[in-house]
């Protein structure tokens, strides 16, 4: 809207009325406000261009051709410690429009953007920054890990730096004093976890191995490692109490008990047996698989006798195959398992 016209009173004119004086003051206030807005407009960077001219897209394309001057200016402006909210918004708008050009070649530029002080800014800056992160990880997935690391870093309390003059005396060395207590607390929480929590943990890991067979080996290693740690940290009295409770609650002659035990034993032994028989596996893997099979067959009381005989027969046939390659045994051998 244009400002109202102001007329200067000549000596021969009549004196201005009070209402006219009031209107004149309001008009002068409006002109002052417009001049302030005009100054802010010229002092702030434009919304769709960078401060040194051109666009971010042009700067990125020039950088790929070897012209690095504008690119260095761009980095310096982003590293300005006194950067304003409006400037951050302008930069983010520019980068969002150039998201397809921000490839892995501009990893250094992305690291500078991720260090921008955006969290304690205005709500507009926060929303614009989050929108930029969403566009970035959607179009350039190579930057997903740095973005997640940056977001996670804001959940960590800042380190306390103790200074004497210009010398850093300590960089939060006192934080290490709590490490033993924190470790003991975490260990006690893990050891005192409810049985149902551990069962759900193992069950979900095994379900993941069904959906991702390529991760089955690593998942089984993880499960065995965690179970061994629980077994080592468990007290003897706790183990005896758990076994006694299991005998009291799970005893009986349920018709489905044998079928469930048979399915579990087969599911556990079959992958190990394949590992043992595969000559392409390293010797240490095959040896470990054999050790697990032997330990399982010798110590698991719930394994049906039929499975024991089948596995012993298969192992004897395999041993005969390795010791006498020219004379394969044609009839299955059975081991007397009455002593087990």
From Swiss-Prot:
GO BP field: transcription initiation at RNA polymerase I promoter
GO MF terms, alphabetically ordered: RNA polymerase I core binding; RNA polymerase I general transcription initiation factor activity
InterPro entries named among the record's database cross-references: RNA_pol_I_trans_ini_fac_RRN3 (IPR007991)
An example Gene Ontology CC term for this record: nucleus
Top-level taxon in the UniProt lineage: Eukaryota
UniProt family annotation: Belongs to the RRN3 family.
PANTHER family xrefs: RNA POLYMERASE I-SPECIFIC TRANSCRIPTION INITIATION FACTOR RRN3-RELATED, TRANSCRIPTION INITIATION FACTOR IA RRN3
Protein name from the UniProt record: Putative RRN3-like protein RRN3P2
Origin species: Homo sapiens
Gene name linked to the record: RRN3P2
């Amino acid at each position: 809207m244009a400002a109202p016209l102001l007329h200067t009173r000549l000596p021969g004119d009549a004196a201005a009325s009070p209402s006219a004086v009031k209107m004149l003051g309001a008009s002068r206030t409006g002109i002052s406000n417009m001049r302030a807005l005009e100054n802010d407009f010229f002092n702030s960077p434009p919304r769709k261009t960078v401060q040194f001219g051109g666009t971010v897209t042009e700067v990125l394309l020039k950088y790929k051709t070897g012209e690095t001057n504008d690119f260095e200016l761009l980095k310096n402006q982003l590293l300005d410690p006194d950067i304003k909210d409006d400037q951050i918004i302008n930069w983010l708008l520019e980068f969002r429009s150039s998201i397809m050009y921000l490839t892995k070649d501009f990893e250094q530029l992305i690291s500078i953007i991720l260090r921008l002080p955006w969290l304690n800014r205005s709500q507009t800056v926060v929303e614009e920054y989050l929108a930029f992160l969403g566009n970035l990880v959607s179009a350039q997935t190579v930057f997903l890990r740095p973005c997640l690391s940056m977001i996670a870093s804001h959940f960590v309390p800042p380190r306390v730096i103790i200074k004497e003059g210009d010398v850093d005396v300590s960089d939060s060395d006192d934080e290490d004093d709590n490490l033993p207590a924190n470790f003991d607390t975490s260990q006690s929480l893990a050891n005192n976890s409810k049985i149902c929590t551990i069962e759900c943990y193992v069950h979900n890991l095994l379900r993941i191995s069904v959906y991702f067979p390529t991760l089955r080996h690593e998942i089984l290693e993880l499960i065995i490692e965690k179970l061994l740690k629980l077994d080592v940290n468990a007290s003897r009295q706790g183990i005896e109490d758990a076994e006694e409770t299991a005998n009291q609650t799970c005893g009986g002659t349920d018709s489905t008990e044998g079928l469930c035990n048979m399915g579990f034993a087969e599911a556990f032994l079959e992958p190990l047996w394949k590992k043992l028989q595969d000559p392409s596996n390293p010797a240490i893997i095959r040896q470990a698989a054999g050790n697990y099979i032997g330990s399982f067959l010798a110590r698991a009381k719930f394994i049906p006798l039929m499975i024991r005989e089948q596995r012993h027969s298969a192992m004897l046939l395999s041993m005969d195959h390795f010791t006498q390659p020219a004379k394969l045994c044609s009839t299955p051998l059975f081991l007397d398992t009455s002593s087990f």
